[in-house]
């Protein structure tokens, strides 16, 4: 395992927070800690960042998904020990993820992710209340690494995504901040091991391990584990600097994606109107929408559908294309009067000379 200078790793996390204006000394931060090596390192690093004035009040959240029996209970005990060691308040909860997935018919991993972030937002609200800080100023810190980002890049390459999807992970997404996105998993494990060698306080489980291992992460029938253990190692054989190279590539994509998203903000402000106060009721695309550049129109439609379907929904390419087809490119982008289509989410797309409406089919009828 490669050695790493503690200060170097903490310096890099501090630089991410500062350069990207993600947090400061007044920022309450909820740390999502599973007990694995990445999130355990995040807990130690966040405490050092707090001491430097790069973060404000801290708290931890641990969610027991009740999927791994006694192993999950041992994870919870380890995180409780870690929180006590660092003198950081701990929020913990148990959620029957398997039962919820069976009830809703959703994928277990998708349900786990959704419930985890719901719990994180609730815990952050409590932390901000205690810190007398507006909720909008609070942050949820996750331990996603350069490895996670590269894995997401390959996963999206396999299943398909829009250009913006190849940025893989953002340093910030709403209240969620990822300060370790430039660090590798190997570096974080070396950091913890070095902490122990230096005599700094560290948590250990009953077997003397410095972090918890989730055995299911090795099960290659799971998509991310397959990419992690089968694809990324082969790619590293070709290029040992894969994490750094793809990291730079994804940052370039992210810069251009941010610029395009800013342009879409302007397009939507001028040519897209929500029906009512929320997009739940639908929206209208003005006639002039069809004359805008296709890449911007496509992104705007994608965003409008995401707002209507919910953040966890996967917007289908066919749905986006069905909305775009309501405008006649050969006629300068004018709406095709009489055009009607039914797309995912039982949404109706209809066009007339006043524009293109996207609304629930029940409202259209």
What do the PLM-derived regions correspond to, one by one?
Residues 2-229:
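Core alpha/beta nucleotide-donor-binding catalytic domains of modification enzymes
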Residues 8-38, 59-65, 95-97, 171, ...:
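AMP-forming adenylation/ATP pyrophosphatase catalytic core
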Residues 43, 117, 197, 236, ...:
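Residue-level marker of positions within ordered structural domains that often coincide
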Residues 73, 102, 225, 240-243, ...:
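Non-catalytic, surface-exposed connector residues within folded enzymatic/regulatory domains
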Residues 191, 227-231, 297-305:
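PAPS/PAP-binding and catalytic site of the sulfotransferase fold
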Residues 196-251, 255-258, 272, 335, ...:
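Mid-to-C-terminal catalytic subdomains of enzymes
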């Amino acid at each position: 395992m490669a050695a790493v200078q503690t200060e170097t790793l903490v310096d890099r996390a501090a630089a991410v927070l500062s350069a990207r204006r993600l947090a400061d000394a007044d920022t309450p931060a909820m740390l999502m800690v599973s007990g694995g090596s990445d999130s355990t390192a995040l807990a130690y690093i966040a405490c050092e960042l707090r001491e430097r004035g790069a973060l404000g009040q801290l708290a931890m959240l641990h969610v027991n998904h009740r999927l791994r029996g006694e192993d999950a209970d041992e994870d919870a005990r380890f995180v409780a020990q870690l929180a006590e060691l660092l003198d950081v308040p701990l929020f913990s909860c148990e959620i029957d993820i398997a039962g919820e997935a069976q009830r809703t018919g959703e994928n277990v991993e998708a349900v786990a992710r959704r419930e985890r972030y719901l719990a994180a937002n609730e815990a952050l609200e409590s932390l901000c209340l205690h810190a007398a800080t507006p909720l909008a100023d609070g942050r949820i810190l996750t331990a996603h690494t350069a490895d996670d980002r590269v894995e997401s890049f390959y996963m999206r390459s396999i299943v398909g995504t829009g250009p913006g999807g190849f940025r893989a992970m953002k340093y910030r997404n709403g209240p969620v901040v990822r300060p370790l996105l430039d660090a590798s998993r190997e570096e974080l494990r070396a950091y913890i091991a070095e902490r122990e060698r230096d005599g700094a306080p560290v948590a250990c489980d009953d077997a003397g391990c410095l972090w918890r291992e989730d055995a299911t992460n090795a099960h290659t029938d799971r998509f991310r584990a397959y990419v992690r253990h089968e694809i990324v190692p082969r790619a590293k054989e070709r290029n040992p600097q894969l994490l750094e190279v793809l990291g730079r590539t994804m940052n370039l994509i992210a810069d251009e994606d941010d610029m395009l998203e800013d342009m879409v903000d302007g397009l939507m402000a001028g040519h897209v109107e929500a029906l009512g106060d929320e997009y739940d009721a639908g929206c209208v695309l003005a006639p002039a929408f069809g004359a805008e550049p296709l890449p911007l129109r496509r992104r705007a439609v994608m965003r409008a559908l995401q707002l209507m379907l919910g953040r966890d929904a996967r917007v289908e390419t066919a749905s986006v294309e069905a909305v775009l087809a309501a405008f006649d490119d050969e006629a300068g982008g004018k709406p095709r009067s009489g055009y009607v289509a039914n797309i995912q989410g039982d949404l109706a797309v209809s066009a007339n000379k006043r524009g293109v409406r996207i609304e629930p089919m029940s409202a259209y009828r």
